[in-house]
Swiss-Prot record:
Residues 50-118 are annotated as: Disordered. The keyword Signal does not apply. It comes from Oryza sativa subsp. japonica (Rice). InterPro entries: HD (IPR001356), HD-ZIP_Homeobox_LZ_Class_II (IPR050762), Homeobox_CS (IPR017970), Homeodomain-like_sf (IPR009057), HTH_motif (IPR000047), Leu_zip_homeo (IPR003106). This is Putative homeobox-leucine zipper protein HOX26.
Amino acid sequence: MSSSSLTTTSSMDSVVDGGLDTRLSLAVGCCPPRRRPVLLFGEVLPSPEKKVAAAAVVAAGKRGREQRGEAEAEATTTRQRRSCKKGRRGRGDDDDDDGDRRSPSGGGGDEEGASRKKLRLTGEQATLLEDSFRAHNILSHAEKQELAGKLGLSARQVEVWFQNRRARTKLKQTEADCDLLRRWCDHLAADNARLRRDLAELRRSSSSPPVSGLAVATPVVCPSCAHDDKRRLAFATAAAAAGDMASN
């Protein structure tokens, strides 16, 4: 009796456990839960080969970033140099009022690229350009087209040549004015020094006591004025002698 009751109880427990497992399987998704693999302590740490590979990847990424930074810096420097060259090349006169800075309507990138190159002229072309510049230093659009046809050049090249020629003329005029002002400044400085010396001599002569009554009666004359009087006297004597020779 007791053995049969135990068998019945165990069978009922197995049925209950089976039903519970079935319900859990249906609730989860008709599949039993997966067990996570157990990793040992040695398997958790990366191997030396993986460490070397990871270090190589990091070093390669760092080198790539450095190379990109150097390339960007070089590109920035190149752009700055090009912009400075364009600014120096495009600098011209500020008083151009005939639209010389504008490109001709029939031109294009080819003419602009050709105008940036150094223009080599023959003797006849240079002479004709100089004559045209002396006649009119600023040309209209029609005059530029006509002169370009005579020279066998583009209108843009003629325009750039006239701009550079005007800039050189203005620079030479400025240098000449500076030279003239420098000479005048030196001349005035010399006159100032001479007048200071004369003033010092006059002060010394006026402060010294008179030696005799004749010295008191003698007027005090500036040395430079006395020199001018002597020069005028010599000039008058030479003019009188020349007049006498002409009358004879």
